[in-house]
Amino acid sequence: MPASDPTARLWAIVARQARVAVVFRRGPSKRVRMLRWDLATDTLEAGQWLSGRLYEDRCDLSPDGALLVYFAGKFRGDVETFTAISRPPFFTPLAFWPGRGAYGGGGAFTSRSELVLGTHAVDRAPLAQAPTSFEVRPCDAAVWPARHGFSPSGAERGAEDKPSPAGRGLVLRRSRSEGAAARPDGRRRLHTLVQGAERCELGRPDWADWDHDGSLLLAERGCLFRRDVARIFERPGSAAPRLVADLRAMRFEAMAPPHEAKAWPFGPQRGQS
Protein backbone atom coordinates (compact mmCIF):
# COMPACT_ATOMS: atom_id res chain seq x y z
CA MET A 1 0.00 0.00 0.00
CA PRO A 2 1.16 3.59 -0.60
CA ALA A 3 3.20 5.64 1.80
CA SER A 4 1.22 7.31 4.55
CA ASP A 5 -0.21 10.80 4.11
CA PRO A 6 -1.30 12.02 7.54
CA THR A 7 -3.55 14.73 6.09
CA ALA A 8 -5.90 12.36 4.23
CA ARG A 9 -8.33 10.02 5.99
CA LEU A 10 -11.20 8.21 4.28
CA TRP A 11 -14.53 6.87 5.47
CA ALA A 12 -17.38 5.51 3.36
CA ILE A 13 -20.98 4.32 3.55
CA VAL A 14 -22.35 1.66 1.18
CA ALA A 15 -26.00 1.92 0.16
CA ARG A 16 -27.98 -1.05 1.43
CA GLN A 17 -29.88 -1.73 -1.80
CA ALA A 18 -27.68 -0.27 -4.55
CA ARG A 19 -24.10 -0.60 -5.71
CA VAL A 20 -23.17 2.92 -4.73
CA ALA A 21 -21.27 4.43 -1.81
CA VAL A 22 -20.35 7.86 -0.54
CA VAL A 23 -16.76 8.54 0.44
CA PHE A 24 -15.68 11.24 2.89
CA ARG A 25 -12.13 12.45 2.37
CA ARG A 26 -10.90 14.43 5.38
CA GLY A 27 -7.80 16.55 5.29
CA PRO A 28 -6.78 19.16 6.25
CA SER A 29 -8.46 18.47 9.57
CA LYS A 30 -11.31 20.96 9.21
CA ARG A 31 -12.21 20.20 5.61
CA VAL A 32 -14.02 17.17 4.20
CA ARG A 33 -14.78 16.32 0.59
CA MET A 34 -17.61 14.02 -0.46
CA LEU A 35 -17.32 11.68 -3.43
CA ARG A 36 -19.84 9.30 -4.98
CA TRP A 37 -18.42 5.83 -5.68
CA ASP A 38 -20.08 3.73 -8.39
CA LEU A 39 -19.25 0.26 -7.14
CA ALA A 40 -20.24 -1.44 -10.40
CA THR A 41 -17.60 0.45 -12.40
CA ASP A 42 -15.25 1.66 -9.63
CA THR A 43 -15.54 5.23 -10.85
CA LEU A 44 -15.75 8.20 -8.51
CA GLU A 45 -17.52 11.53 -8.87
CA ALA A 46 -15.89 14.25 -6.79
CA GLY A 47 -18.29 16.62 -5.07
CA GLN A 48 -18.27 19.49 -2.61
CA TRP A 49 -16.03 20.24 0.32
CA LEU A 50 -17.41 20.95 3.77
CA SER A 51 -15.53 23.37 6.01
CA GLY A 52 -16.05 22.07 9.52
CA ARG A 53 -16.15 18.84 11.49
CA LEU A 54 -18.09 15.94 9.97
CA TYR A 55 -19.20 13.14 12.30
CA GLU A 56 -19.04 10.22 9.90
CA ASP A 57 -20.46 7.70 12.37
CA ARG A 58 -23.66 9.80 12.66
CA CYS A 59 -24.25 9.80 8.89
CA ASP A 60 -26.33 7.43 6.78
CA LEU A 61 -27.14 6.79 3.12
CA SER A 62 -30.64 6.03 1.89
CA PRO A 63 -31.11 2.42 0.69
CA ASP A 64 -30.95 3.50 -2.97
CA GLY A 65 -28.00 5.86 -2.40
CA ALA A 66 -29.91 8.94 -3.53
CA LEU A 67 -29.90 10.83 -0.22
CA LEU A 68 -27.43 11.38 2.60
CA VAL A 69 -28.15 12.46 6.15
CA TYR A 70 -25.10 13.93 7.84
CA PHE A 71 -24.13 15.57 11.12
CA ALA A 72 -21.54 18.35 11.13
CA GLY A 73 -20.27 21.17 13.29
CA LYS A 74 -18.69 24.55 12.68
CA PHE A 75 -18.85 25.68 16.33
CA ARG A 76 -19.32 29.34 15.62
CA GLY A 77 -22.30 31.66 15.56
CA ASP A 78 -25.76 30.62 16.69
CA VAL A 79 -25.61 27.18 15.06
CA GLU A 80 -22.81 25.12 16.58
CA THR A 81 -23.79 21.84 14.92
CA PHE A 82 -26.45 20.69 12.49
CA THR A 83 -28.06 17.68 10.86
CA ALA A 84 -28.84 17.94 7.15
CA ILE A 85 -30.08 15.91 4.19
CA SER A 86 -28.33 16.27 0.84
CA ARG A 87 -27.85 14.55 -2.52
CA PRO A 88 -24.41 12.92 -2.89
CA PRO A 89 -21.80 13.99 -3.71
CA PHE A 90 -22.97 17.42 -2.54
CA PHE A 91 -23.41 18.82 0.97
CA THR A 92 -25.97 21.45 -0.14
CA PRO A 93 -28.83 20.88 2.34
CA LEU A 94 -32.34 19.94 1.25
CA ALA A 95 -33.44 19.93 4.90
CA PHE A 96 -31.61 21.33 7.91
CA TRP A 97 -31.90 20.95 11.69
CA PRO A 98 -29.76 23.19 13.94
CA GLY A 99 -28.21 21.53 16.98
CA ARG A 100 -26.46 22.43 20.21
CA GLY A 101 -23.15 20.70 20.81
CA ALA A 102 -21.71 17.49 19.44
CA TYR A 103 -24.09 15.06 21.12
CA GLY A 104 -27.33 13.67 19.73
CA GLY A 105 -27.27 14.74 16.07
CA GLY A 106 -27.39 12.73 12.87
CA GLY A 107 -29.93 10.26 11.56
CA ALA A 108 -30.63 6.90 9.93
CA PHE A 109 -32.79 5.96 6.96
CA THR A 110 -35.35 3.21 7.44
CA SER A 111 -36.48 3.48 3.80
CA ARG A 112 -35.98 5.73 0.80
CA SER A 113 -38.50 8.17 2.21
CA GLU A 114 -38.31 7.75 5.98
CA LEU A 115 -35.66 9.11 8.33
CA VAL A 116 -35.06 8.44 12.02
CA LEU A 117 -33.59 11.62 13.46
CA GLY A 118 -31.13 12.04 16.32
CA THR A 119 -32.24 13.64 19.56
CA HIS A 120 -30.85 17.14 18.91
CA ALA A 121 -33.00 18.22 16.00
CA VAL A 122 -34.31 21.36 17.64
CA ASP A 123 -35.94 23.08 14.66
CA ARG A 124 -38.10 21.17 12.20
CA ALA A 125 -39.42 24.15 10.26
CA PRO A 126 -37.13 23.51 7.25
CA LEU A 127 -38.98 20.24 6.63
CA ALA A 128 -41.46 22.36 4.68
CA GLN A 129 -38.95 21.94 1.85
CA ALA A 130 -39.38 18.15 1.84
CA PRO A 131 -41.89 16.35 -0.40
CA THR A 132 -45.05 15.19 1.31
CA SER A 133 -43.98 11.55 0.97
CA PHE A 134 -40.88 12.08 3.12
CA GLU A 135 -41.34 11.34 6.82
CA VAL A 136 -39.16 12.10 9.82
CA ARG A 137 -39.63 10.48 13.21
CA PRO A 138 -37.75 10.57 16.54
CA CYS A 139 -34.72 8.46 17.31
CA ASP A 140 -35.36 4.71 17.57
CA ALA A 141 -32.77 2.85 19.65
CA ALA A 142 -33.40 -0.36 17.70
CA VAL A 143 -32.72 1.24 14.29
CA TRP A 144 -29.62 3.31 15.03
CA PRO A 145 -26.91 0.71 15.82
CA ALA A 146 -27.73 -1.63 12.92
CA ARG A 147 -28.05 0.94 10.13
CA HIS A 148 -24.77 -0.09 8.45
CA GLY A 149 -25.32 -3.82 8.82
CA PHE A 150 -22.96 -4.58 11.70
CA SER A 151 -24.31 -6.33 14.80
CA PRO A 152 -22.72 -7.38 18.10
CA SER A 153 -20.50 -10.42 17.72
CA GLY A 154 -21.47 -13.49 19.67
CA ALA A 155 -17.89 -14.74 19.52
CA GLU A 156 -15.86 -11.76 20.73
CA ARG A 157 -16.74 -9.27 23.41
CA GLY A 158 -16.99 -5.69 22.19
CA ALA A 159 -16.69 -6.68 18.51
CA GLU A 160 -19.20 -6.29 15.69
CA ASP A 161 -19.81 -8.69 12.80
CA LYS A 162 -21.15 -8.28 9.28
CA PRO A 163 -21.63 -11.42 7.14
CA SER A 164 -20.51 -11.38 3.52
CA PRO A 165 -23.37 -10.90 1.01
CA ALA A 166 -21.82 -13.81 -0.91
CA GLY A 167 -22.33 -16.22 1.99
CA ARG A 168 -19.76 -19.00 2.53
CA GLY A 169 -19.85 -18.27 6.25
CA LEU A 170 -17.40 -15.39 5.73
CA VAL A 171 -17.69 -12.57 8.27
CA LEU A 172 -16.06 -9.14 8.56
CA ARG A 173 -15.36 -8.46 12.23
CA ARG A 174 -14.33 -5.12 13.66
CA SER A 175 -13.24 -4.33 17.20
CA ARG A 176 -11.91 -1.20 18.81
CA SER A 177 -8.17 -0.86 19.25
CA GLU A 178 -6.79 -0.37 22.72
CA GLY A 179 -3.85 1.61 24.03
CA ALA A 180 -1.76 3.99 21.95
CA ALA A 181 -3.08 2.73 18.61
CA ALA A 182 -6.68 3.59 19.42
CA ARG A 183 -8.37 6.67 17.96
CA PRO A 184 -11.07 8.48 19.89
CA ASP A 185 -13.33 8.62 16.81
CA GLY A 186 -13.23 4.82 16.54
CA ARG A 187 -11.85 4.81 13.01
CA ARG A 188 -8.75 2.82 13.91
CA ARG A 189 -10.63 -0.37 14.55
CA LEU A 190 -9.06 -3.76 14.18
CA HIS A 191 -10.58 -5.61 11.21
CA THR A 192 -10.55 -9.37 10.78
CA LEU A 193 -12.03 -11.80 8.27
CA VAL A 194 -13.46 -14.85 9.98
CA GLN A 195 -14.66 -18.13 8.50
CA GLY A 196 -15.37 -20.78 11.09
CA ALA A 197 -12.18 -21.27 13.10
CA GLU A 198 -10.00 -19.48 10.52
CA ARG A 199 -9.00 -15.82 10.81
CA CYS A 200 -7.26 -13.35 8.53
CA GLU A 201 -6.10 -10.15 10.19
CA LEU A 202 -6.61 -7.03 8.07
CA GLY A 203 -4.93 -4.61 10.45
CA ARG A 204 -6.34 -1.15 11.15
CA PRO A 205 -7.62 0.39 7.93
CA ASP A 206 -9.55 3.62 8.32
CA TRP A 207 -12.65 1.85 7.00
CA ALA A 208 -13.78 -1.53 5.64
CA ASP A 209 -17.10 -2.93 4.42
CA TRP A 210 -18.62 -5.34 1.92
CA ASP A 211 -19.67 -4.59 -1.63
CA HIS A 212 -22.89 -6.31 -2.69
CA ASP A 213 -20.92 -8.75 -4.87
CA GLY A 214 -19.02 -10.06 -1.83
CA SER A 215 -15.74 -8.27 -2.48
CA LEU A 216 -14.15 -6.36 0.38
CA LEU A 217 -13.82 -2.57 0.19
CA LEU A 218 -11.06 -0.85 2.17
CA ALA A 219 -9.82 2.67 2.83
CA GLU A 220 -6.31 3.29 4.11
CA ARG A 221 -3.84 6.19 3.97
CA GLY A 222 -5.93 8.24 1.58
CA CYS A 223 -6.57 5.41 -0.90
CA LEU A 224 -9.50 3.13 -1.75
CA PHE A 225 -8.98 -0.57 -2.39
CA ARG A 226 -11.03 -3.56 -3.51
CA ARG A 227 -10.14 -7.09 -2.50
CA ASP A 228 -11.59 -10.42 -3.72
CA VAL A 229 -11.75 -12.49 -0.55
CA ALA A 230 -14.22 -15.22 -1.54
CA ARG A 231 -11.52 -17.89 -1.33
CA ILE A 232 -9.01 -16.11 0.87
CA PHE A 233 -8.58 -19.10 3.18
CA GLU A 234 -8.22 -21.56 0.30
CA ARG A 235 -5.82 -19.46 -1.80
CA PRO A 236 -4.38 -16.70 0.41
CA GLY A 237 -2.10 -15.31 -2.30
CA SER A 238 -5.03 -14.65 -4.63
CA ALA A 239 -6.60 -11.97 -2.41
CA ALA A 240 -4.19 -9.05 -2.81
CA PRO A 241 -5.93 -5.64 -2.62
CA ARG A 242 -6.41 -3.72 -5.88
CA LEU A 243 -6.07 0.05 -5.85
CA VAL A 244 -9.30 1.77 -6.90
CA ALA A 245 -8.35 5.41 -6.32
CA ASP A 246 -5.62 7.49 -4.70
CA LEU A 247 -7.25 10.59 -3.19
CA ARG A 248 -4.25 12.01 -1.36
CA ALA A 249 -3.44 14.77 -3.85
CA MET A 250 -6.84 16.49 -3.66
CA ARG A 251 -6.86 20.14 -2.70
CA PHE A 252 -9.74 22.32 -1.57
CA GLU A 253 -11.78 23.97 -4.31
CA ALA A 254 -15.06 25.84 -4.07
CA MET A 255 -17.84 24.08 -6.00
CA ALA A 256 -21.31 25.42 -6.68
CA PRO A 257 -24.01 22.74 -6.58
CA PRO A 258 -25.72 21.81 -9.86
CA HIS A 259 -29.47 22.27 -10.14
CA GLU A 260 -30.23 18.62 -9.37
CA ALA A 261 -28.35 18.84 -6.06
CA LYS A 262 -30.88 21.41 -4.87
CA ALA A 263 -33.96 19.29 -5.64
CA TRP A 264 -35.38 16.17 -4.01
CA PRO A 265 -34.94 13.01 -6.12
CA PHE A 266 -38.63 12.10 -5.91
CA GLY A 267 -41.87 13.96 -6.24
CA PRO A 268 -44.71 14.78 -3.88
CA GLN A 269 -46.60 11.48 -4.21
CA ARG A 270 -47.52 9.69 -1.02
CA GLY A 271 -46.88 6.04 -0.37
CA GLN A 272 -43.41 6.02 -1.94
CA SER A 273 -40.82 3.96 -0.03
Residue ranges of predicted features:
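Sequence signature of WD/YWTD-type beta-propeller architectures
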Residues: 1-273
